[in-house]
Amino acid sequence: MSQDLSSLINHLIDRRQALHWMGAGSLGLALNSNLDLFAKNPTRKILFFSKSSGYEHSSIRRNGAELSHAEKVVIELGKTHGFDVVATKDGTIFTRQNLKGFDAIFFFTTGDLTQAIGDKNPPMTIEGKVALLEAIRSGKGFLGSHSATDTFHSPGLEFETQPIERRDPYIQMIGGEFIRHGPQQEAAMRVASPHFPGIEKLGTGFKIKDEWYSLKNFAPDLHVVLVQVTQGMEGTDYRRPDYPATWARKDGKGRVFYTSMGHREDVWTNPDFQSVLLGGIAWAVGNVKAATPPNISEAAPKAETIPPKPTKT
């Protein structure tokens, strides 16, 4: 680890507190002991970044110096399955030198992260954003949960699809973009890639209660893993055909994985979600191989259909 990165990590996390947080047995995690995707591999290092330059979700909100619920869960998963996690909200960590110390970057973020708004934590610089995208294209893994698609929005109207060349470079990388969401509700995830890591034991799909994002601007090369089943869902945001909710894609040499799940705190300890997440992590860091050909036209052929724009009352 570089001296620059090491000193920053020491500044961000008090080691005595880290030992307490990393032993968070009181979380009641629904760990999947049969999911062994990290054995016989070098210990991977993941940067979990959760700055909010906009709405801050309760699952990533810290209480003083105490780590957030999602941070604790990811750290505990790492401890159990054999990967290291550095959790921060400090955008100054994004430099070319610092990113060399990680195998993957995990975003649970909102807004324009170069702006010092929202949670008031130090923002990423413009150069830091460039360094992030360069690192991914050069081979670093990237993972995004929930509001990672509500980050660095593309210019243009909310209820219109933007051409690829007009999408923000970050949106081009992650492969989709948030429009809006309806009320929290139980909804069905349909498995579109049964052989993707972490998905094998989920059968044809599962149901889970969460806040569900309506998404647009899908990359044409998405390998769709889970599909949002919209039939029966409450809210005009879901008056559209089924669309991708979890996917994988390559960005240059980098492996990109995203799931729209993760708003609710109880989702983070749900065994199905953890199975999906661990499979995505293992693939993104290169521990496991998986065929990820584009399949969006088969898995969700009408995904680009935008829901109706709400009428003003």
Question: Model segments located where?
Answer:
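N-terminal secretory signal peptides
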Residues: 1-14
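Aromatic-Pro/Gly-enriched surface loop or interdomain linker
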Residues: 12, 38-101, 295-312
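N-terminal export leaders
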Residues: 14-23, 29-31
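Extracellular ligand-binding/catalytic regions of CAZymes and related secreted enzymes
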Residues: 42-43, 70, 80, 233-243, ...
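A glycine-rich, often tryptophan-bearing local segment used as a flexible ligand/cofactor-contacting loop or short
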Residues: 112-201
